Each structure stands twice: as structure tokens, then as C-alpha cells.
From Swiss-Prot:
Entry's EC annotation: 1.-.-.-
Domain of life: Eukaryota
Disruption phenotype: Impairs the production of neosartorin and accumulates two isomeric metabolites, moniliphenone and 2,2',6'-trihydroxy-4-methyl-6-methoxya-cyldiphenylmethanone.
Stated family: Belongs to the paxM FAD-dependent monooxygenase family.
Pathway listed: Secondary metabolite biosynthesis
Originating organism: Aspergillus novofumigatus (strain IBT 16806)
Protein name: FAD-dependent monooxygenase nsrK
Function: FAD-dependent monooxygenase; part of the gene cluster that mediates the biosynthesis of the tetrahydroxanthone dimer neosartorin, which exhibits antibacterial activity. The two different monomeric units appear to be synthesized by the same set of enzymes, among which the Baeyer-Villiger monooxygenase nsrF is the key enzyme for the divergence of the biosynthetic routes. The pathway begins with the synthesis of atrochrysone thioester by the polyketide synthase nsrB.
SUPFAM superfamilies: FAD/NAD(P)-binding domain
GO molecular function, one term: monooxygenase activity
Residues that coordinate or bind FAD: R146, D340, G353
Amino acid sequence: MGSITESQEPLRFFATGDKHESASSARPPTYVQVLIVGAGFAGLMAALECWRKGHDVVGIVERNQGPNYSGDLIIIQPSALEIMKHWPQMRRELEEDKVTVGTYYYRHNGELVDGPAHPNYNAPEYVAEREARPGGFPYVGAVQIRKKFYRMLLRQVARLGFRVDYGQRVESYFEDDSAGVAGVRMTDGSIRKAHVVVAADGFRSRSELLIADEYLPTQSSGMSVYRTAFPAKLALADEAVRQRWGGKHTYEFWMGSGMHIGLYLSPELAAFGITPRDHLLAKDKVARESWDPDVSPDEVIDVLRRAKVPGDSIIHWPLRWRNLRREWVSPGGRVVQIGDAAHSTVPSSAAGGTLALEDAITLATSLQIASSPAAASGPGAGAGAGVPLGTRVYNLLRYERASCTQKMAFVNAQVLGDTTDWDAVRADPSKVRVRYPKWFFRHDPEGYVYEKYGQAFAHLVSGAEFHNTNIPPGHQFVHWTLEGIHREMAAGKKVEDLLDGDWT
């Protein structure tokens, strides 16, 4: 699938593209060999963008036995969709699948608090801003169906001739500075190498042991989530569901004491996510970190009294926090983490999928610029020499942004699950809306690398001053910990009131 030992036909295809497949055109080759571990959103987008930037994707390995279609709804914000101007087929598919329904916010007693509301990134001024850019993506759906979005990425990867090697588990990561390569040892004893290995394999990636010598400890957020998606006809078989939602296309949040629920119903799909505080759970129902749909509706009934869903279709996922580590790159710079392997997020951030795609775009672009001097002399001993610089630039550009985004998760969690002053909400219903800050959704990850690479290079090489501008304007970034945030919340403080700068 693009290695130098295979036939020349796929190599020619990778280098020139195929206009009949509506694929993007690849840039001049950098001769950087890229091995990707993990075929989720981050890994697949990394494969696509690395190909487009001229890198040689020599492998995509995935531990699951096949594509993992678990999940329900995702939110991909405009900052990650800007890149679709380079991928016309995916852009068309997104346009066909977009969800335009408004969002409704209810109290647990049925009182409509707000709605139909739309994400502020679809406010007229921001839609016009994106529409004015060549190939811009004007209207962005409030949600995407995860299965459809994931299949779209898989189809585009297949169009480029790539194959995902499923059922491949990584035993360990390694790098060899003298040889200028990194690699993975698989559980079957085989070894795979490349100039750079992209760890896109999620929580507890084995890459952590190379980068930090240990796994990051986790802490309970005091919440977990029951989530599922299934054909709408199964839900509509229930009389109460038909009376309340029959024939509607709706996206709703229901807010109660110690719990909030997100609900989506369309003619084809029903989905919900129930996020209770841990004190509402039975003692023997502590969630484990697994995307296996192994929860029965009876368990959900214990929390919510009733759920009309098919058996063994629900995932119970603990919302566990991890302090964000500054380093996402191995000591030699040839193993690099993206997506959840680098920074865990929770649903209330409304940004996990967006960050994963932004990471992939940023990394591919950073490697392109870092490798351009070696690429000018063609393949050979110098190929891949710029990789360590490229991965470190990527890390520098992404860490603070990911940290600020994680903090927004606390804001949204408090808004949806801890609101008590309903008179204030009635006076200003926007107080309960999920926050989509403009500093986040107006970002252009590809353009940002081109803008900041020189400054980042000077900072890494000579210690020159460097400031990221992909975080809230006016914010003075400082490293923070989950323990500190928990103390503030336990004292009754709102995280939103503790933020400096413009987080709107």
C-alpha cells in the first residue's frame, strides 16, 4: 500500500492522484515515510493529509478486527471542515448528510427553556465569512452521524488505494536516532518501520511508555455516559415515543438535577446520551473505558426509569479526566501522538472529533515544511531528516489549544448538569446553550502552520519568544491541573467565571 517494495502502479497513483475519483491532488513528494497506528478519525485524516502533502504513507494498522462503527452523534466544527475544500468528494457527501435541525433545551419537567437554537458558528456573520473564502464551507450541521462521517473517511482512504491492516496490535513503540527511523513491534513478533510513526491509537497508547515512561493516571469526573444509536423505527414502535416525537426531526437537551440527556431523532436514526452523576448509579454499575455495546436497557432504567432501546446496544463510558501532558513527541522526535492518544476529551467539550482532525492536518503540514529542504535533493539518505523538527513544531502549535479546549468541557458540563437558577435562564435562555467559542471554530489549522512555522522554528532552535494565537484572545496561558479545577468546582465556583480573556 505505497511501500517501495510494491508495484509502481500504486506509487504513481499516490503521486498524481486520479481525477476520475474526485480525489485531491498530492503535493510534490517529500520522501518521508509515515506509519500510522490507529484507524479512527485522527488516523484516517492523517493518512489523507499526509498523502496530500506528499508524504509516503507506508501503512495503517488497527487493533480492531474491522471498522468500529460504535458511537452515535459527533460534532465537527468549522475549523476541521475547512480542509474539505481540498477533498471535493467528501465535501459533497458532507453537504448531502448535514443536519440542519435546530436544538431545543428542556428542563426535566418538560418546560421548554430555549429553542430552536443553532450553534453560533452558524450565525449569519460567520456563515458569510466562510462563504467568502474560496471553497469555504458556509453552513455546518449542528451534529454529524458518526457512522456516516467515519464511513466517508474510510471511502476516501480507499479511493487513494490505501488498505487498513486490521487485527494488528502494537506491543511497543521504538525509535533509532542513528538510523533516522521509528517503528512498532507487533504482538505477532513482526516489526514495522518508517521515518515517523503516528500514534493515533487512543487512550493508553503504548506510545506513552516511549514518550513519558508511564501511562497518565486517570481521575473520575464524577460522571459517566450511557449512549446508543439505533434505527428510529425501533423507538417509534413505542406509543409514548410516537406521541411525543413521532414524525419529528429533533435534537434536544434535557437538563435535571445531577443529570443531563442529549437526544436525537430523525426518520432514520434514534440516539441518546444520558450523563448522570456517579451518585445516581448502582454501586455495581461503575463504567469501564470500552466502546463495546454491552449494556442492557434494564441498567439504564435503573438510572432513568425507562428506555425503549434494543438490548445490548448501549455503551456505558466513564467520563474520566487526564491531566494534559505537554510532550506528545518521543525524545528523538520520530513517534508523535495525535487525537485521544495525545489529549483525552469528554462529550461536553463538543470538540473531541474536531481536535483529532485538526491534529492530523497540523501534523501533515508541519512535516511538509520541515521536510522541504531534504525533498529538494530527492530520495536518499536525507529523506526524513526534518521529521523531528516537524513533530516538535506540531506539538508546540497544538498543546495550548488542546488545553484550553479541555477547560471548555467543564464549562459545558456545568451549564447542562448543574444549572439551578431557572429564573435567570428564563430571562436569558442562551445561558443554557452549549458553548461553541469563536476562537475555536474560526481557526484554520493548515493556514496556522504556514503562518506560525517560522516563529515556532526560531523558538525551538534558538529560544526566541513565541505566542500561540489559536487560543482565546487576551488569555494568559498557564498550565493547569484537574485537581485545581475540581477544588474550584467543589467550592461552588463556575469555571466560566474563572476564565481570563475572551472565551466567547
